[in-house]
Amino acid sequence: MAETDSGKTAEERIPFNYFKKIPKIELHAHINGSISSETIKKLIQRKSTKEKGQNNVVSQWETTILKGDEKNLDECFKMWDFIYPLVDDTEAVFLVTKSVIEDFAQDNVRYLELRSTPRANPKTGMTKESYIEAVLAAIEEAKTTVPDITVR
C-alpha cells in the first residue's frame, strides 16, 4: 500500500466497503467473462459428476486460472479454453447467468447490460436458440431473487 501525506493508506482513508455501497451501472458485461471462482468450482463439480474421468478439469483450472495474480494477455485468453467446455449445456448457461446477475447485485450494481455470443453444442443438445432461452430464463428469475437490479 502506498502511504499518503496523512500517513494512512487509501484503504484506511476510504474503506473498500464504501465503494461497494455506491449504486453502480455496468453497460458491457460478458457473461462468461464475469463468472466468479465460486461458480466455476460449482461448474467443475457438476461436470466431474456428470462425466467421470474429468479430474483433469480441476488440474487445468489450478494451472491456468489460479496460477498467481499476475497474468499476461495470452494467459488471460486461455481462460476461455477452460470455461467454454464447462458452460456447454442450457443448465450451465442458466446457472452461470443467474450467478453473474447475483454477483453484480451483491456489488450494488443497479443496472446491468449482459453480453454473450450464443453457442450451439450438438453433444449436449444445446442450440443457439436454447442458449438464448436459458439466458432469458435466468434474467426473468433474477427479477424475483434480486429485484433491485435491472438486467438487459
List where the protein language model places each region.
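Metal-cofactor-binding active-site regions of metalloenzymes
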Residues: 2-152
